[in-house]
Amino acid sequence: MKLEPLLLEISEYCRQVGLAESTFGRAAINDGKLVSRLRNGGRITTETLDRIRGYMAANPAGEGRRLIVQRRTPSPRHQDAALGPTAEQQSSTRNQALASLAAQELSPSLAEQQITRVTNEPSVDARQNFRFYDNRQKYLLFVNTCSEKWEIANRVSLELANLHPRPPALRVFDAGVGDGSVLARVMRSMHDRFPTMPFFIAGKEISLEDVRLTLQKVADRFFEHPGTVLVLTNMAYADAPRLSVRSLKAASSLVWHEVALRGNTSHSFEEQITALEPFLAANWKATVNPQTGGSVYERPVVLVLYREDHRFLLDPIIPRLGATAANYDLVIASQPYRARASTEFKARRVIAPLVRALGPGGRLIGIHSYGHDPAMEIVHKVWPNDEPFITNRHDLLKAVKTELGAAGRDLNFNANSDARSLFRYDMHTLPSEVEGSIGTSTLFAAWNAAIYVAQVEDERLAPVVARGDYLDATRQVLQEHGGLWFYDESFVISRRRD
């Protein structure tokens, strides 16, 4: 049998019900790797197919059932186990088991978080307004199959030659840390160019999962460059560079956590960073803005990391609550906004606040998707009139200049030529993977990358997935070009030196 229709059906079912694909596999046939094996060309028996179909039929997606995870205190272990389950408990066993599987993926601490109910109420608020590019699985698939992070780090590193840092430290702000791949690579480049200079590096990231991934990459950075102060925060663009919030209500709930790492090996640093997991799980929380559907923090958090044995050297640059200046030498603004957001929004809410954080001689490098590449050919084969990249660098710089007004007189706005501004990144494939018959896993990865970059919403994806012709469009583009690549464009805003 052809597996593509079944994979599409499972994917759509999981999206509607709100299950991860691994959870679906465990719930349906007790195999969490079911979907991944099918995508990699695995086979199933007719009996297994019947079990999968039977599970979806017994738990229809159309009823709007959602899995709700709530906190509660675990039941005491000494409760009377001799009393058997009630009839009500027996009738809910199936739903509780399914909910528990979901909790393993949604909850960072199963000892504190348990499933208490499955609701049949349809969701109508913005929290259920799922956006494709916020999906963790698809985000991680994109960053691990494409070289964008590498190329962005290479482009940012070119700006280091133009910096003229002043004592006491080279100051860098990353306006969207993501999984930390770009920042870690840039930190290596910084050490290569400025091996003895103290670093103050601050990064904004609201996603708990991305903060975890970032922290996994920095232990060796403290070993190679001990004169480093690393700060992570979930504050908004207007507040994050100065590590202070303007709202009195938010300021009263601010969590400021300083960690002086002991020892002198990457292993000891990693152990102490990993031990921060309970702190992160308890404090790095986000909710959904009911008006915009975007993520906002529950409380502002600042996490400060540095080596204890270098505290004396780093004392002048360790940030203090309420007394942190911006004055950054380099600001990295890599994909910091939605592609389809208005030019005015990008200029006013994102770029302008970051530009104001530049110190004398400081440079902001902005990077966003450009289009005009094979990936957009895939999108246009499915949605011929779709144009996700509505703002080019020229229009954005003009809007930022207007927004800043007189405050922008000492700034240079550098759009640069296409030859210098544009750069390409690729999806990783072997030549044999795009010649002749292209495997399903390669097609799915290419399709995922194309619609992730184009930020296609789920509402438009559902009918396309149901038709199933999107893989044919993807196959045609891959065979025509011998692979898949994308273009980003960059721009620089620099402040004049005194």
Identify the meaning behind each predicted range.
Residues 122-167:
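Class I SAM-dependent methyltransferase Rossmann-like catalytic core
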Residues 167-180, 202:
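Conserved class I S-adenosyl-L-methionine
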Residues 125-127, 188-326, 449, 456-466, ...:
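Class I S-adenosyl-L-methionine-dependent methyltransferase module
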Residues 361-369:
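Conserved beta-strand signature within the Rossmann-like core of class I S-adenosyl-L-methionine
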Residues 36-53, 433:
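Short, basic-rich loop-to-helix N-cap that marks the start of a DNA-contacting helix
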Residues 324-325, 345-360:
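A short glycine-rich, Lys/Arg-flanked "PGG" loop and its adjoining helix->strand segment in the class I
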Residues 77, 94-138, 266-286:
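N-terminal, positively charged/glycine-rich alpha-helical extensions of SAM-dependent methyltransferases
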